[in-house]
């Protein structure tokens, strides 16, 4: 559907005869009212399921003492990240689906980018740390408690957040140091980096290189950690004679590998490509998938085949029903 130019809430500032934009318009998926109502209902349902699933998993780990080990502590942090990740973007999207005023301030756009890149990058590092945790638990189970003590997993979690904050700060500062003096319409549902670079009237060549090499380096390092960790896990599996033992390991590791594959696959598609291959409409759908849909899927992926989580869930529900 062709779009009509949006002039509402187009605030600009005149600086040295150059009009600087102070408010952006998030165009979203479509102008069709009925489709926007459908999208509102769909994304509201996804958001509710995301919060219930992720926060429910956090409560489950806190409540059940059998889940008090590093593997589930990492899972708790991942669930908290996913709840925050979704909450940074979804509420504004929901408002825009039903509103004619789809504006977001310059500062609001920068804040949104800073937060979602922080949570997204932190999740990359955390998934690598979780793979390393699985390697230690399976390859050297007798030394697991020592090698993955609080003195190890707490710094890993802190390092993941630190890396996420640093990466997000670099891109947010680099992006919002550019000049925006033409159209203020962002062809996206949130303030992502590629559509903002496309909107800038400055030379964005260095920004594109920064995005490619920073995102590419993080992807390369974290995926390499995952592959090496699971290489050792595979060696450990080959040494196990028990079919039941192998099934248990595949059940635990399969969930993590599924989550890693989906997350990193979409990240690679989004950010580690030549700029000539970018299609903003296509990227909008893909980025919405990894920022909105994946946080909903993670609790399902990590708990669906996990006997300990399902047993803890049954016990918690039973206890609640008895008290009622």
UniProtKB/Swiss-Prot annotation:
GO terms for molecular function: G protein-coupled receptor activity; olfactory receptor activity. The keyword Transmembrane helix applies. One of its GO terms (cellular component) is membrane. Disulfide bonds join 109-201. The keyword Glycoprotein applies. Residues 1-37, 88-111, 167-208, 271-283 are extracellular. One of its GO terms (biological process) is G protein-coupled receptor signaling pathway. Glycans are attached at residues 17, 101, 277. It is found in: Cell membrane. Keywords: Cell membrane, Disulfide bond, G-protein coupled receptor, Glycoprotein, Membrane, Olfaction, Receptor, Sensory transduction, Transducer, Transmembrane, Transmembrane helix. Pfam families: 7tm_4. The chain crosses the membrane at residues 38-58, 67-87, 112-132, 146-166, 209-229, 250-270, 284-304. Potential odorant receptor. Belongs to the G-protein coupled receptor 1 family. This is Olfactory receptor 5T17.
């Amino acid at each position: 559907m062709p779009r009509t130019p949006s002039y509402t809430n187009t605030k600009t500032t005149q600086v040295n005869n150059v009009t600087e934009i102070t408010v952006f318009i998030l165009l979203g998926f479509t102008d069709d009212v009925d489709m926007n109502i459908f999208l509102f209902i769909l994304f509201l349902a996804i958001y509710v399921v995301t919060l219930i699933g992720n926060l429910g998993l956090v409560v489950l780990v806190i409540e059940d003492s059998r889940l008090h080990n590093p593997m589930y502590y990492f899972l708790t942090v991942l669930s908290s990240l996913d709840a925050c990740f979704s909450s940074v973007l979804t509420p504004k999207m929901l408002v825009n689906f039903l509103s004619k005023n789809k504006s977001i301030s310059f500062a609001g756009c920068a804040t949104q980018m800073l937060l979602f890149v922080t949570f997204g990058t932190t999740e990359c590092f955390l998934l690598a740390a979780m793979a390393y945790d699985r390697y230690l638990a399976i390859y050297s189970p007798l030394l697991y408690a020592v090698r993955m003590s609080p003195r190890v997993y707490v710094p890993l979690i802190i390092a993941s957040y630190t890396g996420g904050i640093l990466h997000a700060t670099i891109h947010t500062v680099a992006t919002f140091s550019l000049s925006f003096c033409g159209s203020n319409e962002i062809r996206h549902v949130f303030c992502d980096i590629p559509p903002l670079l496309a909107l800038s009237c400055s030379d964005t060549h260095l920004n594109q290189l920064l995005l490619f090499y920073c995102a590419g380096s993080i992807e390369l390092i974290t995926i390499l950690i995952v592959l090496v960790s699971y290489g050792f896990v595979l060696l450990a599996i080959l040494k196990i004679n028990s079919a039941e033992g192998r099934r248990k390991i595949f059940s635990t590791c399969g969930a993590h590998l599924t989550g890693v594959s989906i997350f990193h696959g979409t990240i690679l598609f989004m950010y580690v490509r030549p700029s000539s291959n970018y299609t903003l409409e296509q990227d909008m759908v893909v980025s919405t998938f990894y920022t909105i849909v994946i946080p909903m899927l993670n609790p399902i992926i990590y708990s669906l085949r996990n006997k300990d989580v399902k047993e803890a869930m049954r016990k918690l529900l039973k206890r609640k029903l008895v008290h009622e």
